[in-house]
Amino acid sequence: MPTVHLIIKGRVQGVFFRATAKDVADETGVVGWVKNTKEGHVEIMASGKEEALQKFIAWCKIGPQKAIVNDVATRRVEEKKFKNFQIVRG
C-alpha cells in the first residue's frame, strides 16, 4: 500500500490532533503512527489505499476543531507495513 510521511505545522499540539487523527485513520482504514515533535509540529507516517490516504491527508489539512493548520508537508516514501494506527508518545 502507498505510504506517506506528513509534517503538520501550526497550532497542532494540545488540541487533540493525535487522538483525532487516530480516530480518522481507524475510520478510513489508514495504518501507521502519529507523534508530536520537539519543534511543536505533528509527524505522521501513514499507509493505506490511495483513496483512504487522500481522505486522511485532506483531514490533516484541517485537523480537529481547535487546531489551526498552517502547513502540511507531504512526501511519498517507500512502502511501510503497519498493523494498525498508533499514537506514539514521548
Describe each region flagged by the PLM:
Residues 1-90:
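Intrinsically disordered, low-complexity, mixed-charge
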